[in-house]
């Protein structure tokens, strides 16, 4: 899911089959159920194999409820602010796994695997198989502008700081 129609459009342009626009997110039990139902309705197999969640907070439980049998829920971060509390019985009911993805630790603990991953990504980039979306390039001395732009959720893609 994404927070705006503009971001949904970009996701579809980059190959997403469908996108859920969550706006300000589920703020109570009823809206959380609605969000979960909407996510489930977009799945073609009764739930998702993998959920990539960099947001957390009130989005986590509805997202997890939309996971399919033996799905994996990847905890990437907590951009929405609060660390979520998931009912652990959902893992049992769905035969699902919750996996913490901490790239910083991975790069140090699994150096060779990380090196291979970077080489694979560079190959995809050089072959044109993936194309990063750069929303804006900002001079390094204006880094505060970049931080504010990201903080206001006004970015679609990446902000790149450049040296003059």
Q: What residues fall within each predicted segment?
A:
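Short catalytic-loop micro-motif centered on adjacent basic/acidic residues
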Residues: 49-52, 72-75, 132-135
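Glycine-rich phosphate-binding loop and adjacent beta-alpha segment
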Residues: 2, 11, 58-129, 162-164
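Short conserved AdoMet
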Residues: 44, 68, 154-155
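C-terminal capping/lid region of NAD(P)-dependent oxidoreductase domains
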Residues: 122-123, 127-136, 144-164
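Short, hinge-like loop/turn segments at secondary-structure boundaries
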Residues: 15-21, 37-38, 90-94, 115-119, ...
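Adenosine-nucleotide cofactor-binding segment
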Residues: 1-58
């Amino acid at each position: 899911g994404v927070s705006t129609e503009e971001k949904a459009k970009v996701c579809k342009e980059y190959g997403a089959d469908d996108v859920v626009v969550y706006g300000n997110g589920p703020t109570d039990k009823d809206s959380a159920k609605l969000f979960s139902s909407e996510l489930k309705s977009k799945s073609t197999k009764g739930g998702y194999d993998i959920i990539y969640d960099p947001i957390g907070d009130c989005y986590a439980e509805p997202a997890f409820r939309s996971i399919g049998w033996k799905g994996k829920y990847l905890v990437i971060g907590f951009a929405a602010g609060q660390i979520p509390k998931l009912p652990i019985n959902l893992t049992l009911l769905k035969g699902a796994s919750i996996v913490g993805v901490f790239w910083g630790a991975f790069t140090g603990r699994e150096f060779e695997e990380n090196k291979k991953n970077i080489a694979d990504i560079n190959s995809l980039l050089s072959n044109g198989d993936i194309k990063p979306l750069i929303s804006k390039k900002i001079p390094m001395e204006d880094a505060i502008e970049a931080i504010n732009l990201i903080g206001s959720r006004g970015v679609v893609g990446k902000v790149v700081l450049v040296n003059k």
